[in-house]
Amino acid sequence: MGDKYRDPVHGFIEVTDLENEIINSAPFQRLRNVKQLAMTYLVFHGAEHTRFGHSIGVMHLVTRAFDSAVSNGSYSFSDEKYAWYKQLLRLIALTHDLGHAPFSHASEAVFPDGLEHEDFTEKIVKETIIATHIKAIGATFVEKYGPEYDITPELICDIYRGRLPGENSEFTFLKSFMDSELDCDKMDYLLRDSLFCGVKYGNYDIERLLSSLTIYIQDGCPRLAIGSGGTQVFEEFVLARYFMFVQVYFHRTRRFFDIMFSQALKCILPDGTYPQDVNDYLMWDDCRVIQELKAHVDDNDACANIVKRVVYSCANESVTHPKSGDRSPHHFGLCSHHNFER
């Protein structure tokens, strides 16, 4: 039977019963308390949306994108492969952000050495109840189509992280729906972030973009592509991303709070970093971090700045596109209480 989720960006989104088991699991429900845009809500007050809605939205878009590309392209799959590939993509999309730390990318400065949020995602997919639910979905495909159509946590992670051998593998085609200049992750977050930030910069014609997707055959293997009639909407999509980075993601006040947040985390986290154990890691979400920030307001300036929304004055700001050799795409200095920081 399945279920439906009413999404503010895409309308009703359908999920199967087994997919709903993943959504209702504790690791996935944690994403309700992980903001998509970190401290951005202190600048654009509507930006309270979370990784939960984004993950479901990406699953919805990757389904539509795959259907459209295959329908428009000249590369065909068997019915069994078509169903298998689509289910693989839906699971990759649904689980791709499970490893995000509280306040998303703003936390990455305090990850254990050598680890990224993708590493925690892989641990969660393989080592928690998520693995059990994925294997249950795989079992239905084995029963219906045979053992070559099994779906495992390892396969989900390998496709998403590009570890499968063979550059011309059909799995490379699948990966491009989630990691390319035309991926469904970007398609969703641009629209979702624009909506909740109350800006228009990230808007583009999603229907035209999806309907323009096709398959290009290169050396006998499928590649995700845009049809000749979709050139303009693809340009619109690229520009939408550019303007969102300039106007929202690199907003100087938002970047200030990212810096404060990184400093605060080093104070409130045990040993100044998130735990490596996946179960301990999953105990951390935005709510717990906010509680810890409030508990340290009186003994840490960075914590106080976030909780009380104290913003330093901007002393100088570089151009958006720095010359070669600059450390980051956006530099600015902060001035407060006669102290100058760079």
What do these predicted ranges mean?
Residues 1-91, 99-322:
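Sequence-structural signature of the catalytic-core scaffold of metal-dependent phosphohydrolases
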Residues 326-342:
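Short Lys/Arg-enriched alpha/beta "domain-start" segment
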